[in-house]
């Protein structure tokens, strides 16, 4: 059994950090958590205004007011995702943001996050392009982590069930 994780972030640079994480589980359960950038001892100050306007639509103020503490987010992810033999994400950026999140919490994940194209290549011989094409044609990504994780799961389900 496998789970899907998706992140939204403050931007797309080496200075960016996770602002929302969501997951989708085999039973159809999905969840997302906003992350409070003030709850880390790391210097999470980078903010890409264009990413806010064009991608995730979240303000830093919303994150500061409604976001969870990084330690609480990591503990929740470890509890929920630690029971799955495989946890997939759809980009290497997600791997980067997972590392940044756990570093900020001074914790380690209880699961291994694998980029989906590597898994699909090994499982079905499918290239990243197949996944991207299916993702673009079968669903609309809203850049809301929980919703997007669920959409990614639907696409992967379709690809692995295809002859």
What function would you assign to each model-found segment?
Residues 2-3, 7-95:
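Conserved non-catalytic scaffold segment of RNase H-like nuclease domains
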Residues 39-42, 47-53, 60, 115-153:
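Active-site-proximal helix-loop-helix substrate-binding element of RNase H-like nuclease domains
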Residues 52-55, 66, 80, 101, ...:
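Residues that form generic nucleotide/phosphate-binding pockets
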Residues 85-91, 97-101, 130-163:
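Acidic, Mg2+-coordinating catalytic module of metal-dependent nucleases/exonucleases
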Residues 93-113:
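Substrate-recognition/cap helix-loop segment adjacent to the acidic, metal-dependent catalytic center
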Residues 109, 117-120, 163:
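Short non-domain terminal segments
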């Amino acid at each position: 059994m496998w789970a899907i994780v998706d992140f939204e972030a403050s931007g797309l640079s080496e200075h960016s950090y996770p602002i929302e994480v969501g997951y989708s589980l085999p039973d159809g359960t999905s969840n997302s958590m906003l992350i409070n950038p003030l709850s880390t001892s790391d210097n999470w100050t980078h903010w890409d205004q264009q990413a806010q306007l064009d991608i995730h639509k979240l303000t830093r103020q919303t994150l500061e007011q409604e976001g969870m503490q990084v330690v609480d987010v990591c503990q929740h992810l470890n509890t929920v995702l630690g029971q799955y033999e495989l946890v997939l994400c759809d980009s290497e950026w997600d791997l980067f943001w997972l590392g940044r999140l756990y570093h900020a919490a001074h914790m380690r994940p209880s699961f291994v996050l694998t980029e989906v194209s590597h898994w699909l290549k090994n499982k079905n011989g499918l290239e990243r392009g197949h996944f991207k094409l299916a993702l673009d044609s079968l669903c609309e990504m809203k850049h809301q982590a929980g919703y997007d994780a669920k959409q990614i799961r639907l696409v992967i389900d379709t690809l692995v069930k295809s002859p």
